[in-house]
C-alpha cells in the first residue's frame, strides 16, 4: 500500500478528483482552502498573498499508486501557467 499526498494550486481541483476516480482510488480525503509557502511564494487567500491550494490524501495498492503517480506527473506537465501539482508517495505498512 502507498499513501499519496497531492497538493494542487489552481482554479480547477476537479482535474485531480477526475484522475483519482479514473484510477479507482477507492477512497480519498480532500482538504480545501489550504494555505502555505512554497518555491513560488506564499498562498494565504489574502490580498497580500492571494491563492490557496487543495490537497488530498489517498491510500492505494502499490501498482495502482504507480499508475496514478504517472498520470499526475503527465497532468502536471500540461497545466496552465500559474497552476501546480505536487505529489508525495509514502509507504504504508497498515491501514484500517
Task: Please tell me what each predicted stretch does.
Residues 1-96:
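Positively charged, small/polar-rich N-terminal and surface patches that mediate targeting and assembly
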Amino acid at each position: 500500500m502507498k499513501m499519496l499526498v497531492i497538493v494542487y494550486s489552481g482554479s480547477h481541483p476537479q482535474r485531480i478528483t477526475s484522475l483519482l476516480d479514473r484510477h479507482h482510488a477507492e477512497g480519498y480525503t480532500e482538504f480545501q482552502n489550504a494555505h502555505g509557502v512554497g518555491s513560488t511564494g506564499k498562498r494565504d487567500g489574502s490580498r497580500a498573498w492571494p491563492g490557496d491550494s487543495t490537497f488530498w490524501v489517498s491510500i492505494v495498492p502499490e501498482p495502482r499508486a504507480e499508475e496514478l503517480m504517472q498520470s499526475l506527473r503527465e497532468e502536471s506537465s500540461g497545466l496552465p501557467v500559474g497552476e501546480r501539482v505536487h505529489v508525495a508517495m509514502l509507504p504504508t505498512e497498515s491501514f484500517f
